[in-house]
Amino acid sequence: MEKIVLLLAIVSLVKSDQICIGYHANNSTEQVDTIMEKNVTVTHAQDILEKTHNGKLCDLDGVKPLILRDCSVAGWLLGNPMCDEFINVPEWSYIVEKANPANDLCYPGDFNDYEELKHLLSRINHFEKIQIIPKSSWSNHEASSGVSSACPYNGKSSFFRNVVWLIKKDNAYPTIKRSYNNTNQEDLLILWGIHHPNDAAEQTKLYQNPTTYISVGTSTLNQRLVPKIATRSKVNGQSGRMEFFWTILKPNDAINFESNGNFIAPEYAYKIVKKGDSAIMKSELEYGNCNTKCQTPMGAINSSMPFHNIHPLTIGECPKYVKSNRLVLATGLRNTPQRERRRKKRGLFGAIAGFIEGGWQGMVDGWYGYHHSNEQGSGYAADKESTQKAIDGVTNKVNSIINKMNTQFEAVGREFNNLERRIENLNKKMEDGFLDVWTYNAELLVLMENERTLDFHDSNVKNLYDKVRLQLRDNAKELGNGCFEFYHKCDNECMESVKNGTYDYPQYSEEARLNREEISGVKLESMGTYQILSIYSTVASSLALAIMVAGLSLWMCSNGSLQCRIC
């Protein structure tokens, strides 16, 4: 009879109504890293490292770049005859120069403070070329004879378009005294130069005067140049050299020139009509007839991600460059789908928050929720409130990270002349150091946020579990795997009240108490039976052992192996 009662109790327990708290799982193979773990599979993740580009030069926010093709910046500004297509250029967003442009200084020489001029151009978006000293105004000097085979045009000798190489006229080179007053409202970029002949014979042949000078003065500039006559190797067929200079002439300031030879005078100047963020980018790419917000020498980036690893030099509203190969933010939960064999052994699921072992692929409309089973059937239901709060929290966090990082950030290269190599090396080391710091910060940020996100989901599941536990109290039994077994019948309406937090504990407490006492009684009676069996088994085992010992002793005494004395 006791066995029948025990069996009925067990059957009753198996058929008891249950409700379980669980979380979503899917077929995702996305993996993230955290502070504590690597390659954690999650249900949802968001890549925040841009690794692709289009391989083209594009307009930046609708403004075309100035692509100099085979011309250098110096060739463009001075007016190399092979750069005539750039005589007048519209507004540009950035300037593109090849690493080794063919059309540079056609007449060999040097451009003074060239790197500083390029740096200035990185803050300019538009020039307007204006004539300041007409070529026709040099009546006492030859203004058209200053040409060279080093600067050919249509098979003939020519010269830079924007400056004038002044030669003697009628065996005389009268001293030049010229001024230009900047009456414009904008700054002016003015260029001039000096010719360094190969020998004294060339000096007098071109300028008549054996000893010459050039003086240039503004409110901030005081310069005096003298030609350096020396025998040199030929470059572009020329043993002579030219050296070019530049200055920015402010409004209402005047520039004064004085020279008695070797003077390369300005004819045109550049009015700086628009300043803004620009850059000179070294690239061999072609124009792609496209638009972007971020340009690199490798191609354009169209991305809302906060980081990229394409190229450290950028122009526009760009993600920050890092040296990382992978930055993935966890937005979902740990993805550990429940296995069928575990379901048979441990119930419906098993431990995201320390006590649930696997997620539910059957629950597709939320991150956290319930699985119930009763006489009316079973099913999954997401907890919409906790899921929505979690989605909002994770979304806000991801957006916050992107907004903080995805600000306008320009990293343009700095050029240094040959005398500044140590500064250039130091600059590169500093930039590499900054990139290392950015990379470390980005990777650490992702690891920490992923850890927090997964802990956040764990906490939400635990909170949902506690919400149910506090409602049910002793009306149900905790099974230790995220499930509760009711001590009373719980139909679908009852299950729904548990899910929405309106469960009426007093309504079911009496039924639960009676069932709880009945189950406890069955356990006690079963325990009494097991205790009797235990005592009987112990006594029987001891008696059998005593008989075996006595028999062994008698056998040993009979064959002399053991001496027996009875006192």
Swiss-Prot record:
Signal peptide feature range: 1-16
Residue intervals on the Cytoplasmic side: 553-567
Keywords: Clathrin- and caveolin-independent endocytosis of virus by host, Clathrin-mediated endocytosis of virus by host, Disulfide bond, Fusion of virus membrane with host endosomal membrane, Fusion of virus membrane with host membrane, Glycoprotein, Hemagglutinin, Host cell membrane, Host membrane, Host-virus interaction, Lipoprotein, Membrane, Palmitate, Signal, Transmembrane, Transmembrane helix, Viral attachment to host cell, Viral envelope protein, Viral penetration into host cytoplasm, Virion, Virus endocytosis by host, Virus entry into host cell
Intrachain S-S bonds: 20-483, 58-290, 71-83, 106-151, 294-318, 490-494
S-palmitoyl cysteine lipid sites: 557, 564, 567
Residues of the site described as Cleavage: 346-347
GO biological process: one example: fusion of virus membrane with host endosome membrane
Modification after translation: Palmitoylated.
TM ranges: 532-552
InterPro entries: Capsid_hemagglutn (IPR008980), Hemagglutn_HA1_a/b_dom_sf (IPR013828), Hemagglutn_influenz_A (IPR000149), Hemagglutn_influenz_A/B (IPR001364)
Topology, Extracellular side: 17-531
Carbohydrate-modified residues: 26-27, 39, 181, 302, 500
A GO CC annotation given for this chain: membrane
UniProt keyword Transmembrane, yes or no: yes
GO molecular function: host cell surface receptor binding
Gene3D superfamilies (UniProt xref): 3.90.20.10, 3.90.209.20, Hemagglutinin Chain A, Domain 2 (2.10.77.10)
Entry keyword annotation includes Membrane: yes
Membrane topology classification: Single-pass type I membrane protein
Main localization, broad class: virion
Subcellular location: Virion membrane; Host apical cell membrane
SUPFAM superfamilies, sorted: Influenza hemagglutinin (stalk), Viral protein domain
Additional notes on this entry: Major glycoprotein, comprises over 80% of the envelope proteins present in virus particle. The extent of infection into host organism is determined by HA. Influenza viruses bud from the apical surface of polarized epithelial cells (e.g. bronchial epithelial cells) into lumen of lungs and are therefore usually pneumotropic. The reason is that HA is cleaved by tryptase clara which is restricted to lungs. However, HAs of H5 and H7 pantropic avian viruses subtypes can be cleaved by furin and subtilisin-type enzymes, allowing the virus to grow in other organs than lungs.
Function: Binds to sialic acid-containing receptors on the cell surface, bringing about the attachment of the virus particle to the cell. This attachment induces virion internalization either through clathrin-dependent endocytosis or through clathrin- and caveolin-independent pathway. Plays a major role in the determination of host range restriction and virulence. Class I viral fusion protein. Responsible for penetration of the virus into the cell cytoplasm by mediating the fusion of the membrane of the endocytosed virus particle with the endosomal membrane.
Subunit structure: Homotrimer of disulfide-linked HA1-HA2.
Protein family membership: Belongs to the influenza viruses hemagglutinin family.
Name of the protein described by the UniProt record: Hemagglutinin
